[in-house]
From Swiss-Prot:
Function in brief: Catalyzes the rearrangement of 1-deoxy-D-xylulose 5-phosphate (DXP) to produce the thiazole phosphate moiety of thiamine. Sulfur is provided by the thiocarboxylate moiety of the carrier protein ThiS. In vitro, sulfur can be provided by H(2)S.
InterPro entries, alphabetized: Aldolase_TIM, Thiazole_synthase_ThiG, ThiG
Family, per entry: Belongs to the ThiG family.
Assembly and binders: Homotetramer. Forms heterodimers with either ThiH or ThiS.
Keywords, sorted A to Z: Cytoplasm, Schiff base, Thiamine biosynthesis, Transferase
Enzyme class: transferase
Keyword Ribonucleoprotein attached: no
GO cellular component annotations of the record: cytoplasm
Catalytic site: K103 (schiff-base intermediate with dxp)
Name of this chain's protein: Thiazole synthase
Primary location: cytoplasm
Binding site for 1-deoxy-D-xylulose 5-phosphate: G164, A190, G191, N212, T213
Length: 265
């Protein structure tokens, strides 16, 4: 893979196509070790759950994951309305000195964490109007993804399966439809369980993959982070290389017979 093959979001290019969350680790030191092993450049942070300066008497994630070394992606995990999500990202912009690249998620159900798309669309419209560059967690509905792009989202992030489920890529066909129609990056968000899931997403043509539980919840998070790095890179290279068509039978022998020396009688 050449250095020219980069992920570009909102005008900024990244060498890594793996985005990693910062929740569920043992401590901030393990978080940093996993991020380093993953090779990620974009790190997502749940503003409602992680201290990035709003609690000055507590350890801050920014001491371990400084904005000078990573692109921070504030997210609205835990928000169930457009209003809550917008307020949360306004706070993030204030805490991060005007940072405007954000990840929007508006949840609809606390049990399955499925996105509430009407509220998501409403929040996207407001945030774009306020100058945010919005990456949006959404369903794998191509129509909804097109609506988000039309509203000004800089990336759409359809779920592969439920958040934290580890179920992998359940509907590759919808993902392909979204990829084929989109002029903004398409990143799988939620549901990745192991390295092969990440590779499949990339082989389908996704521009990137975001994950948290698959790494933080592994028996060895640092080793899994390394595995995910290789899977994303390998899946991307396979997509660029182009797989052979699937066929029930080979159309011709894999070893051609033309030009072979005839057996001596």
């Amino acid at each position: 893979m050449t250095t020219e093959d980069t992920l570009t979001i909102a005008g900024r290019s990244y060498q890594s196509r793996l985005l990693v969350g910062t929740g569920k680790y043992q401590d901030f030191a393990q978080t940093r070790a996993a991020l380093d092993a993953s090779g990620t450049q974009i790190v997502t942070v749940a503003i409602r759950r992680t201290n990035i300066g709003q609690n000055p008497d507590e350890p801050s994630l920014l001491d371990f994951v400084p904005p000078s070394q990573f692109t921070l992606l504030p997210n609205t995990a835990g928000c169930y309305s457009a209003d809550d999500a917008v307020r949360t990202l306004r706070l993030a912009r204030e805490l991060l000195d005007g940072h405007d690249l954000v990840k929007l998620e508006v949840l609809g159900d606390p049990q399955n964490l499925f996105p509430n798309m009407p509220e998501t669309l409403k929040a996207t419209r407001t945030l774009v109007d306020e100058g945010f560059k919005v990456m949006v967690y959404c369903t794998d509905d191509p129509i909804q993804c097109r609506m988000l792009e039309d509203l000004g989202a800089v990336a759409v992030m359809p779920l592969a399966s439920l958040i934290g489920s580890g179920m992998g890529i359940l509907n590759p066909w919808n993902l392909r439809l979204i990829i084929d129609q989109s002029s903004v990056p398409v990143l799988v968000d939620a549901g990745v369980g192991t390295a092969s899931d990440a590779a499949i997403a990339m082989e389908l043509g996704c521009d990137g993959v975001l994950m948290n539980t698959a790494i933080a919840g592994a028996r060895d998070p640092i080793l899994m982070a390394s595995a995910m790095r290789k899977a994303v890179e390998g899946g991307r290279e396979a997509y660029l290389a182009g797989r052979v068509p699937r066929k029930l039978y080979s159309a011709a022998p894999s070893s051609p017979t033309e030009g072979l020396i005839a057996a001596v009688k």
